[in-house]
Curated annotation (Swiss-Prot):
Binds as a heterodimer with protein bS6 to the central domain of the 16S rRNA, where it helps stabilize the platform of the 30S subunit. GO terms for molecular function: small ribosomal subunit rRNA binding; structural constituent of ribosome. Gene3D superfamilies: Ribosomal protein S18. It comes from the Bacteria. Belongs to the bacterial ribosomal protein bS18 family. It comes from Dictyoglomus thermophilum (strain ATCC 35947 / DSM 3960 / H-6-12). GO terms for biological process: translation. Keywords: Ribonucleoprotein, Ribosomal protein, RNA-binding, rRNA-binding. Pfam families: Ribosomal_S18 (PF01084). The keyword RNA-binding applies. Part of the 30S ribosomal subunit. Forms a tight heterodimer with protein bS6. This is Small ribosomal subunit protein bS18. One of its GO terms (cellular component) is cytosolic small ribosomal subunit. InterPro entries: Ribosomal_bS18, Ribosomal_bS18_CS, Ribosomal_bS18_sf. The lineage of its organism: Bacteria, Pseudomonadati, Dictyoglomota, Dictyoglomia, Dictyoglomales.
Amino acid sequence: MSNEKTSTKAPKFTYSSKKKFCVFCSEKIDYIDYKNVERLKRFMTEKGKIIPRRISGNCARHQRQLSTAIKRARYMALLPYVVK
């Protein structure tokens, strides 16, 4: 009798997605302005949440600036906190 165990797990499939890139780095934007509402809306969901970095493809530096700019725009009532 053999003590060998057979593997019953299915092989893991990996998928390769397109390499995401930072929009702000490619356009050489150093400062994200909170008054540019149209640009900020592109990085928000329909419900008004900030899209995370792993989905948007932003670098860490620009994602921090983006979230600060969105929060400032919300405080100044340029963007809504919640969309119903």
